[in-house]
Amino acid sequence: MASLYLLLLLPLFLALILAATITESKSFSTTVKAPYPGHKPDKLTHLHFYFHDIVSGDKPTSVQVANGPTTNSSATGFGLVAVVDDKLTVGPEITSEEVGRAQGMYASADQNKLGLLMAFNLVFTKGKFSDSTVAMYGRNPVLSKVREMPIIGGTGAFRFGRGYALAKTLVFNITSGDAVVEYNVYIWH
């Protein structure tokens, strides 16, 4: 009879221990107060500018820093890595007013189609967004008419920023490799 009570009480005892363990363990996530008082990410900002990628001449703004063993024989340049500090301007001409720089890197990361992995900080140097940055990271299928890449963060006015960037190539010089790309960036911050 005692063993019957033991068999009936054992599952109850184990359930109580399990319940106590669950309530004592740390949670994976918690809701916290905003670290910056008054910050409410409810503003949508549209930025429009032109990106000048210069790989030719005496002062290139995009420099190849690495390649793989098959980069030169690959139709997509797979393995190429470049570091950039490209000018961002108000108009499509390189002489138009500079509003910032695109600083970061891109890598040819697709063996079958021309696709770049882009990791950029858009650093703004003029206007109300001066000293603010936007972090853009994603895939750029450069032969598509319009490409979409995610905005994953920012600093300054764009702290806690999120959104997307639309890129459209205006000019690509097949001989020099230089390009002008129009960007429309939408950021919630």
UniProtKB/Swiss-Prot annotation:
One of its GO terms (biological process) is phenylpropanoid biosynthetic process. Glycans are attached at residues 72, 173. The keyword Glycoprotein applies. It holds the Pfam family Dirigent. One of its GO terms (cellular component) is extracellular region. Its main location: secreted. Belongs to the plant dirigent protein family. Dirigent proteins impart stereoselectivity on the phenoxy radical-coupling reaction, yielding optically active lignans from two molecules of coniferyl alcohol in the biosynthesis of lignans, flavonolignans, and alkaloids and thus plays a central role in plant secondary metabolism. This is Dirigent protein 21. It comes from Arabidopsis thaliana (Mouse-ear cress). The gene is DIR21.
